[in-house]
Amino acid sequence: MLIPLREVIAAYNIKLNGVLHVGAHQCEENDAYLAEGVKQDDIFWVEANSKIAKTLTLPNVITAAVSDVVETVTFNVTNNGQSSSILPLKDHRIVHPDVHVVSTESMVTQTLEDIIRERGIRANFLNLDIQGAELKALKGLGPYIDQFDCVYTEVNTRELYAGCALLPQLDDWLRWRGFWRMRTTMFEKCGWGDAVYIRGNDEYCLMSSGRTGNHLFQLAACELLKKATGRPFVVHFVEPWKLGSVLTYTPREGTKSAFQINDEYFEDWSIFKGKEETIKELFAFRTPLVGINECIVHLRLGDLADQTSKLGTAYPLSVVKHLPKGVPVHIMSETPGHPYVHLCLDVIRRAGYAVDVLPAQSFERDFLRLVQAKYVLGSSSTLIFWVGLLGALNLPGKQTSVFLSSNMPMSFRQKTMYTNDPPWFCRLVDIDRGQ
C-alpha cells in the first residue's frame, strides 16, 4: 500500500470491522490490518494466481479471478507475479519493459457479489489491487457496495493494461455511489498509483470556489446527483448565497459536521443537457419574469483577468457586429468607471449606437435584469451561461451571445461550457476569427 493504512484510518476516523482484500499476492498487508484491531478471521483474501494462492497459509484465502460478470477469461501470469492480470499488458510493457507474460491460464471469473454472499463476508474496508480490473470488480459488487465505508484501490492514469479503467472513470463510478476520492499517491511517470475513496454521510457541505455562476453549477450538480441516486442527503453551502431574494432555491448554511466537498469547478454543460426542466424547477424565480426589450453588454472585468490590453478594441468591435437594431443598448459592469468600460462605450458610440453605462446595483438586481433582458452579450463566464439558460427556459425569444477569444482566460471553461458541445440557448462568437 502506497498510502499507509494507519494514516487512512486516522485521517478519516474509520473503525475497521472487516477487510476484503482482492489481489492478495503474499498478504503483505496482514500485519497492518491486525494492528488496526481487525480479527484474523475477519480478513478475507482473494487471489487469482492459483500457484500463489496455494502457498498462502492464512485463513479465508479464496482462489478466484474477479470481474463484473461470470465469463471465461485468459489470466496472464507475469514473471514478477505482481503484474499478472485478466487484461493484456499494454503501456505496462513501455513503463516496465523488464516485465513480461510467462504463461497464461483460462479461468472462469467470479463477481464479488457472489463471493460476499456465498461466504457471508462482513467487511467495511475494500482493498483492490488487481492490475487494471478494479472497476470491473467494483461493478460486480452489486448491492454489497453499500456495506463498505472505504475503498482503497490501485488506479491508473494511462492504459497500462488494455481496456483498463482510468482514474476519472473510477471517480465517476464511485462518486455516483456516494464515495469521494480523498487521497491519491501516484507514480506519475509510470501512470499508476493508489487512491482512497471514503463514503460520505448524508450531509454534503460545498466548499465553493469561484463566484455565483459557479455556485449555481455546483449546487445544481449536487441536486442532480441527489435526484439520480435517490440518496436523501442535504446540501449545505458555506458561501454567502446571493440569489435568495431572486430564486426560491435556498441552500442550508454550511456546517462543520457535514462531509466537505473541496472540488474543482463544475463547469461542464453536458451534465445538465437533457435535464433543463429539472434545472428550471430547481432554480425557479420568486416572482414571474417579464421580458425587457433591451440589449445589455455585460463587462465583468474579472472575467477578462486583466487581458484587456490584449483584447483592445477587438472585443467591442465584435460586439458592435452583433448588436440588435432599434433596441436600447446598455453596458453593465461591476466597475463602471474602469478605463476598458469607457473604451468599449466609445467604440459602440462611434458605431452609431446610443449607449449608456448602467449605474452599479446589487448583484441580485443585476442578475434579474440580465435574465429578463431580451438581448445579452457577454464573455465566456459562468454568470452569462446561467443568464442565458434560465432566461431561455423562462422567456420566449431570449437571445444570449457569448464572445470567445484565446486572449480570454480559462480556456478550459470555453471548451466545457461552450465549444465542446455548444449549448442551444447561446450564440457563440469567435473574436479571433473576426466574427
Where on the chain are the PLM-derived regions?
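Short, aromatic/basic amphipathic alpha-helical patches
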Residues: 56-58, 165-174, 242-254, 338-351, ...
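Donor-binding and catalytic core of enzymes assembling or modifying cell-surface/extracellular glycoconjugates
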Residues: 212, 327-419
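Short internal beta-strands
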Residues: 45-47, 148-156, 234-238, 329-335, ...
